[in-house]
Regions:
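Short glycine-rich, Thr/Ser-proximal phosphate-binding strand/loop in the N-terminal lobe
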Residues: 12-56
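Conserved active-site "lid/cap" helical segment
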Residues: 37-85, 129
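Active-site neighborhood for divalent-cation/phosphate handling
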Residues: 115-191
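Conserved small/polar residues in nucleotide/adenosyl-binding loops
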Residues: 192-198
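A short acidic Gly-Thr/Ser loop motif
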Residues: 6-11
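Extreme N-terminal starter segment of soluble prokaryotic enzymes
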Residues: 1-3
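Short beta-strand-loop/turn "lid" adjacent to the catalytic site in phosphate-handling enzymes
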Residues: 76-122, 150-158
Length: 199
């Protein structure tokens, strides 16, 4: 099974294609300066790494170039995008709505959009990436992975700020916790390296 992992910024698109059977990275790369002059893509596969200029008016064109790099030339790592079984999208803010990763639907996209005031630089970029991927990859299943989900079990005494409660009620102002995907990975690995019990 091959999984494409995506991390979109407002003007960037990081990607990594992983063969889950052997947990091997088949390729990885970065599209930069999307929507600006002098866009570029750096693609690495088969021991070959190259940065080339490109024209990326939107994330859709960037995704199309990623597909081209993965399926042609020296950086080719698959014959066709139909080999990709699923796509994972990093989404920075899931607010109180998303406590775990979930399959992306129109309703999920709308909810991520509603949460954009909590992450105005990141969530809109995540939506751009999801919508662009849908155009390029069609019906490939896509999953949203939320940075905030790891921290969703914090009790109120840990997440409430010493500010008027109405800010929480009206605007959702509270501690959420970030970089949860990194914490989720590092926690069990740390226990293993320190030879501690995981329970």
């Amino acid at each position: 099974m091959k999984i494409l992992v995506i991390n979109c910024g407002s003007s960037s698109l990081k990607y990594q294609l992983i063969d889950m059977d052997g947990e091997k990275v088949l390729c990885k790369g970065l599209c930069e300066r999307i929507g600006m002059e002098s866009s570029m893509i750096t693609h690495e596969a088969n021991g070959h790494k190259a940065t080339t200029p490109a024209i990326f008016p939107t994330h859709t064109e960037a995704f199309a170039e990623v597909v081209k790099k993965m399926t042609t030339g020296e950086g080719k790592c698959i014959d066709d995008v139909s080999e990709i079984s699923a796509i994972g999208h990093r989404v920075v803010h899931g607010g109180e709505k998303f406590k775990a990763s979930c399959l992306i639907t129109d309703e999920v996209i709308n909810t991520i959009r509603e949460l954009s005031p909590l992450a105005p630089l990141h969530n809109p970029a995540g939506i751009l990436g999801i919508e662009a991927a849908r155009k390029v990859f069609g019906n490939v299943p896509m999953v949203a992975v939320f940075d905030t989900a790891f921290h969703s079990t914090m009790p109120p005494k840990a997440y409430m700020y010493a500010i008027p409660y109405e800010y929480y009620e009206k605007y959702g102002v509270r501690r959420y916790g970030f970089h949860g995907t990194s914490h989720k990975y590092v926690s069990p690995v740390s226990y293993t390296h320190l030879t501690l019990p995981t329970n």
